[in-house]
């Protein structure tokens, strides 16, 4: 059984007298910065000139500097920028300000795992990755709770990188819920696979195909939307709360029987083989190479696909139906 670590396992005092620079002030950035600040840490924010987030960070009581200035002042640098921007910002603004004894950290291992960022040997390189969106990380912390997190050490120059990573996880509230140790390779590959095969790619295509099947068979698009998209959350909430078994305990016998006899007709050995191919593309760097090349070209394919998907009938139907639900407004 994988070991989880909690508040008593981490020493927050290891962060005392360290200036922590949060690079980026988006969903995760604001949560990390404010949680660390409320934990008594010295936190500054690094943003590019003219960033729309500067005013928000200042109003939240944080000192804002350019990325270069923040990294020069900091003992600990947490990069919370989108994956595709990290390499360029690192080379221009962060790397020139790295000195022996500094800690370089990430919330996702993409750029380290695929060699886009290659830190010098004289810094610690760690990861602290909350398993929830930034607003949840902040909300749970403010309510005396926390969001579970992963932590990992890629490079231990100081000999104390593991304890430092655990201390940071405690500072953002992770050890209140429990933190799990991993490595950059495992975190990156499982995260990308989950997004592509199940959570985003797999689920999106499943929902669209179900919707299309019903509409093409002559059923009302609104009913198809309810059955194939709207009710996904109801089932997923049951799964998250108690696993597949509790979900099946909560649905009708008709639905449960249909689950068992029809599910494997759809998700079968052929589907699993495609999943294995997706995983292989992630493991051997094919996906990362393609994504980097796409970003270098200013995302033409991604922009095209985004536009095409936004015009799908399910989007038009959903826009009208969502106005019915007061809790979504």
From Swiss-Prot:
Question: What name does UniProt use for this protein?
Answer: Ketol-acid reductoisomerase (NADP(+))
Q: Name one GO cellular component term.
A: cytosol
What biological function has been recorded for the protein in this entry? Involved in the biosynthesis of branched-chain amino acids (BCAA). Catalyzes an alkyl-migration followed by a ketol-acid reduction of (S)-2-acetolactate (S2AL) to yield (R)-2,3-dihydroxy-isovalerate. In the isomerase reaction, S2AL is rearranged via a Mg-dependent methyl migration to produce 3-hydroxy-3-methyl-2-ketobutyrate (HMKB). In the reductase reaction, this 2-ketoacid undergoes a metal-dependent reduction by NADPH to yield (R)-2,3-dihydroxy-isovalerate.
GO-annotated biological processes: isoleucine biosynthetic process; L-valine biosynthetic process
One GO MF term attached to the UniProt entry: magnesium ion binding
List the source organism. Prochlorococcus marinus (strain MIT 9312)
Q: Which gene encodes it?
A: ilvC
Residues annotated as domain KARI N-terminal Rossmann:
2-182
Instruction: Spell out the SUPFAM superfamilies in the cross-references.
Output: 6-phosphogluconate dehydrogenase C-terminal domain-like, NAD(P)-binding Rossmann-fold domains
**Residues engaged in binding Mg(2+) 1:** 191, 195
